[in-house]
């Protein structure tokens, strides 16, 4: 049952996800493609985590955070992709009220953690390249754990705002979400209550996270670039660039899509464009991250060669 009578209001108990397309042939094609992407995402990120665990040369703060970033990538993709894949095969794609709230909260939670982790990793590279003599002190095991816990706490607080907003919304019908998952904007459009204060609070929280993390990343990489340009050793420059380019590529991909979804005015793009960008953000980027790090980071490539016992893999 999609609706229940509650006094003078009709309360929504489930939502219909309209998904990416109604074309049956295209749905099958997308099912195959996205399922393959999800399998590559899980296997690639699990491989990254395992490689970091078993390779002693990767037991450094940067790779400690990278292993957690890989875990978050699996979590972000898993919060949406399995349900989306199943919905390609059914005629009526429905999700319960509770399930919708959990999906929204988990997507926001893991997305915020990823932003914090990328900022922490940028700070780690800043200390390693600009203050190498203080690296062991500034990035001690205790400091790394504190930064990690802080990232999770920040993600939890951010997700709490969105979850509180969701349970405060009054849904009277219709219950058709024009998206492939329970995203915040389509839910706001379906709500029949006054949500202006909650929307401002959620927007402020999102904006704060984006501004703070982008500021940390920008300042860190500006200082890194200045330091690298001052290096006289070509080998030193190459090593510094090697450890930074992979992370900077991931940052560019993530914040490019986040800017499109959350910063650009909604009137500047259509709902279908938003869906495509959301697929890239929640499905494709988690798959690309381990590939980027394995191809562009010499330490990752070296550890992989050592574990596989091969010398000419790359």
From Swiss-Prot:
Coiled coil: none annotated. Gene3D superfamilies: Rhodopsin 7-helix transmembrane proteins. CDD domains: 7tmA_OR5P-like (cd15416). Residues 1-28, 79-102, 158-199, 262-274 are extracellular. It is a multi-pass membrane protein. GO terms for molecular function: G protein-coupled receptor activity; olfactory receptor activity. Glycans are attached at residue 8. Residues 50-57, 124-136, 221-240, 296-314 are cytoplasmic. The chain crosses the membrane at residues 29-49, 58-78, 103-123, 137-157, 200-220, 241-261, 275-295. Potential odorant receptor. Belongs to the G-protein coupled receptor 1 family. This is Olfactory receptor 5P81.
């Amino acid at each position: 049952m999609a609706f229940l009578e509650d006094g003078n209001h009709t309360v929504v108990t489930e939502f219909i996800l309209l998904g990416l397309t109604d074309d049956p042939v295209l749905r099958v094609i997308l099912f195959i493609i996205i399922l393959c992407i999800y399998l590559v995402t899980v296997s690639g990120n699990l491989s990254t985590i395992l490689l970091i665990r078993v390779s002693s040369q990767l037991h450094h703060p940067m790779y400690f955070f990278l292993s957690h970033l890989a875990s978050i990538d699996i979590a972000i993709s898993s919060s949406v992709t399995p349900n989306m894949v199943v919905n390609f095969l059914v005629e009526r794609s429905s999700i319960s009220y509770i399930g919708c709230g959990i999906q929204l909260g988990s997507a926001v939670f893991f997305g915020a953690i990823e932003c914090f982790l990328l900022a922490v990793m940028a700070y780690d590279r800043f200390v390693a390249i600009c203050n190498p003599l203080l690296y062991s002190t500034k990035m001690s095991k205790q400091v790394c754990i504190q930064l990690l816990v802080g990232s999770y706490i920040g993600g939890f607080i951010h997700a709490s705002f969105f979850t509180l907003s969701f349970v405060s919304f009054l849904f009277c019908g219709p219950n058709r979400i024009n998206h492939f998952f329970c995203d915040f904007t389509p839910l706001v459009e379906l709500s029949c209550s006054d949500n202006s204060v909650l929307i401002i609070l959620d927007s402020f929280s999102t904006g704060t996270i984006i501004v703070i993390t982008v500021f940390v990343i920008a300042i860190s990489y500006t200082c890194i670039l200045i330091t690298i340009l001052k290096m006289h050793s070509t080998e030193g420059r190459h090593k510094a660039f090697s450890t930074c380019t992979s992370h900077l590529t991931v940052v560019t991909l993530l914040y490019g899509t986040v800017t499109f979804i959350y910063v650009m005015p909604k009137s500047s793009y259509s709902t279908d464009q938003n869906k495509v960008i959301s697929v890239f953000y929640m499905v494709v980027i988690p798959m690309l991250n381990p590939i980027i790090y394995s191809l562009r980071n010499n330490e990752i490539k070296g550890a992989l060669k050592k574990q596989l016992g091969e010398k000419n893999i790359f």
